[in-house]
Amino acid sequence: NAAGEKFSITTLKYFVSNIKLKKADGSEYVVPQADSYFMVDGRDEDTRFAKVIVPEGNYTSVSFVLGVDSLQNYSPIEDRKGVLNLTTSSDMYWSWNSGYIFFKLEGTSPAINDSTGINIFRYHIGGFKDAMQNIREVNVNLNSGESAQVREGLRSNIHMLVDIKKVFDGTNSFSIAQYPTIMVNPFSMNISANFFEMFKHDHTENFAKVDGVF
């Protein structure tokens, strides 16, 4: 990272939700909430694809929330389906704090002064209230690669790059040695503010002949 610290990642998980796409004409399509919650797990390649059905059109940008909105955090537990089901996503939920962990990054770094020699860092970022508001809406411009040209019966694959170093080296850069563990802590807002810089459009594959999803 920018502080010159070496690190290795053991766990990377985060929620993506509330997906919206904007067309070249300025109109916007909001993916229905029921179809708009995904969890990415760095160790599971199958979770790296967020497949949603959208109307035909040329889409020039996509936005999404990195996290889980307050509506779902407050919803009855029995109504939480898919990746929000606490049976399957219990490691991404604070039962003692009644809220989802939006972003989890864990690993090791020799920069940490740990007498045990384990040298573990943990960043569990969540919270949606004013005192600790970590819900971030990320906007990604698709024009830098190629816009998504969705047509009936065809699929557009939008490829994004996720730069995890931006967690440490974004607008609010920090040292792992100084902050080896951040959970329910106001400093978490400094980290979540770096989420805006993590995502970059790489390229788009248009006109794949698979059912109109991307």
Model-derived segments and their meaning:
Residues 1-214:
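A short, solvent-exposed, low-complexity linear motif enriched for acidic/polar residues
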